[in-house]
From Swiss-Prot:
Known role: Catalyzes the conversion of 3-deoxy-D-arabino-heptulosonate 7-phosphate (DAHP) to dehydroquinate (DHQ).
Any single Pfam family the record assigns to this protein: DHQS_C
The name this protein goes by in its record: 3-dehydroquinate synthase
Enzyme class at the top of the EC tree: lyase
GO cellular component: cytoplasm
Keywords from the UniProt entry: Amino-acid biosynthesis, Aromatic amino acid biosynthesis, Cobalt, Cytoplasm, Lyase, Metal-binding, NAD, Nucleotide-binding, Zinc
Organism listed in the record: Geobacillus sp. (strain WCH70)
Biological processes annotated in GO: amino acid biosynthetic process; aromatic amino acid family biosynthetic process; chorismate biosynthetic process
Record-level Gene Ontology MF annotations: 3-dehydroquinate synthase activity; metal ion binding; nucleotide binding
Amino acid sequence: MEQIVIETKTKQYPLFLGEGIIESLPDILRQLSFSKGTKLLIITDKTLEQLYLSRLCALLANDYDVYTYVIPSGEEAKSFEQYYACQTAALQYGLDRKSLILAFGGGVVGDLAGFVAATYMRGIPYIQIPTTLLAHDSAVGGKVAINHPLGKNMIGAFYQPEAVVYDIAFLRSLPEKELRSGFAEVIKHALIRDRDFYQWLRQEIRELADLKGERLQYCIKKGIEVKASVVREDEKETGVRAHLNFGHTLGHALENELGYGAMTHGDAVALGMLFAIFVSERVYNISLDYDRFSSWFRTYGFPVSIPKQLNINRLLEKMKGDKKARAGTVRMVLLKDIGMAEIKPLDDETLLALLRKFQREEGENDPRNSRCHYC
């Protein structure tokens, strides 16, 4: 079991990483001073309930009062209705300020359960137990939120967990599309801050099937280390932490416009990163070898163009709702070079022209468009 220290200006906490480490959870809780008899509320989703929940409850039942709340699987669960239902469950189970919430699942569960913890009785402890590759990003750094019909993650808080317990054995049950979705965030971390890691990914992860064993654990560790280094510098996203939104300006707009769940978060972010590289080459008058990136992304099955059915003007309006925007002006995270990110404001006219060009030029290269994969 590896241990990584996550450090911010307000808190320091451990991240435990390894195969089969969930069996050590009772010991970890004792190490974190959660005494016998503490009330635990496990928030998870339908998929994890069927696969692992009974095992997790049995693991903890000897030492703790264990309660559960199960949400629907999928992005739609990051809603006010589910948030309110979780709060109701916490009240009915009699949780107090010494109780603990366990966020057992992927990014949706982590975001929702973390926001429940941040606001229940003005804040109680929680621990992230991620079960997806995507959650290597969302489980670290304390950003918790639910969605609003007008925008993704618009209602939330910065609230750090007590710990992260990342057992990569859970990733074996992931379908290919979810593994691909999480890998997009791994690529993101390399592109914004670690050129050497980017080169390693190109050499070692030739296909999604390579994401297993030591390679998988290394990917997770490197991604977490990049995320931790950024969060250490900027916990509340006032500066460089916004670089972690590389690919998310268009990505979130696509998710919102298509309807949450129609396109996986990772597919949307991958397409957003490709567009950001496309824009970077034109804004900075440089070559990042865009065509090579497009081919590379395609080998993993990522979409490489904006679905032709989507209206570009509507997409722009969604992008203007991004949290990085200022006074109605879109601010995108671009690359000056691999490993060197920067936030750049872009006017509507420039963005519309680039969106249209990107949609037109890449449309013929993406087989998903021809069969209306998302629309």
